[in-house]
Amino acid sequence: MSSTTHFPDAEGFQQQSDNFMSWLQASPGVQLNPKLRLADLRAIGAGRGVVAQSNIPEGEELFSIPRAMVLTVQNSELRTLLGENLEEQMGPWLSLMLVMVYEYLQGEKSRWAPYFRVLPSRFDTLMFWSPAELQELQASTIVEKIGRSDAEKSIRDSIAPILAKRPDLFPPPPGLSSWESDAGDAALIQVGHVMGSLIMAYAFDIEKAEDDDDEGEANDESYMTDDEEEELLPKGMVPLADLLNADADRNNARLYQEEGALVMKAIKPIGQGEEIFNDYGEIPRADLLRRYGYVTDNYSVYDVLELSLETICEAAGLANADPESQPRLEFLSSLDILEDGYVIPRPVNANPSLEDILPAELVVLLATLTLSPDEFKQRVSKDKAPRPVLDANATAILIRALQMRQAQYATSLASDLQLRASLSPLPETGNVDEGARRVRMALQVRIGEKEVLQTVLGMLQPATSGSLKRSANGYGGDTRQSKTQRV
C-alpha cells in the first residue's frame, strides 16, 4: 500500500495506469478477467488497487501472467549481453537489482517500461528514514534490521564495478558524466535503494516451472546478501500481482505458480465494487513498516516483543552473553538451542497462558541459567537440556529482563497512548507532511511492542508463586524445527 505522495506525477497517474493495462492486454499469453479494473485509490491513501467490477465466485481466475512476462534475471536481455550467470555470481537479490537498474536506465527501450511507470518512486520504508525519524522507533529492534550501510556496501562492491565497466549498457543519466564520480556514486546508491525497496516490497520467489501449483510468497528479506540468501529461489517482479494492496482481514486472492504462468485466483467470493487484496502473512507492524512502508491496525495482532540474549544474561547477573566465556550458554549452543534473541508474540486468546506465548527455547535458557552447579554438571554429563519449566527463579530473571527492556524505551506506554489520543487524523490526500506521517507510524509500532511487554509482565506476576510446566518438545533430540528464527 502506498500513499498519494509516493506517486508524484498526479496528472499522469491515470494515463500511466491505462498504458500499463493496455501493455498487459497486448502482451502474448496474458489473461485478464474482464470483471477487474485497475483503480485509482489515492483518495483513500492506497495508490493503485485492483477492484471487482462485478461479482466473482471463489476459485475464479483473476489474471494470468506468463512466466516470460515476469521481470527476472532470466527474462532480461542483460544476462545475455553480459554473458555471465548473474544469479550464481551475485545471488538472487543483487542480480535482480542489477537487472532492474539496467531496465530502468533503458527507459522507453525496456520491454517493462509501462510497468516501471506504475511502480512507486518514493517510499516510507525504514531504509529512507532520517536518523531523527528512526529515533521515533526508540528501542524497537526493527532498527537493527534495516541494514542501510550493508546494503550500500553491497551496491558499491557488486553493482558499481559492472556499471563502471560497461557504460554502454548502463548509460549515466543526463547531467551525470560517470558512475565513478562522487555524483555518480550518489546516483547509483539512490537508484539502488529504489530498486532494492521495490524488490523487498513487491517481488515474489519464483519456483521452477515444473513445481506446479505452489503458492507465490512475497519475499521478506532485506536486500543484502549472505550465504543463506544466495541459496534462495530466484526473485521476480510480477506485473499486476504486485499492484494488489494487502489486508490481513480482507485477503481474498492468492498467487499460484503453474507451469507456464503465475495465476492469481479468488480464494473467497468477491462482491462487485470490492477491492482485491493479497496478504503479507502474519507479520508484526514493525516488519510491515520496514518492508512495505506503512502500518495498519489490523496487523496489530501480530505485534511482537523481541528480547535479546544480552538483556537476559544481564538480568541473570552474567558478565556477558558470549558462549565462549559462559559455559551454560556454550552448552545450549552445542545443543543447537541457544538464540541471539527471542520473539514473544502478542497474546490474542481470550485467556492467554504463558505456555502459549513464551518460546520454549527462552524457557529452557532461563531454566539453564537457574540450575545449581551440581545440576548443571549433571545436564552436561547427560548432554541434555533441562525441561522447559518456568519456576520462580526463572520467572524472576524474565521479569528483570522485561523491566530492563521496558527501560530502553524513551517514553512509557501510557504517555504514548496519551500522545496518540491527542493527534488529529492526517488527511488521506493532498500534501501530507512526510515527517509527521512517519512519526505517527513509529508511534504505532512502539505502542504495539510496549503493549506486548506490559501484558506479559502482568501475566508473569502471578507466576512467581508457582511454576509453568510445558512439554519437552523433543529437546533431547532434534530441536531445530522449533527454533525461534529472527528475521
Give the ranges of each region predicted by the language model.
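Long, positively charged leader/targeting segments at protein N-termini
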Residues: 2-69, 74-77, 117-487
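Eukaryotic helix-linker segments that join adjacent hydrophobic helices
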Residues: 69-71, 76-129
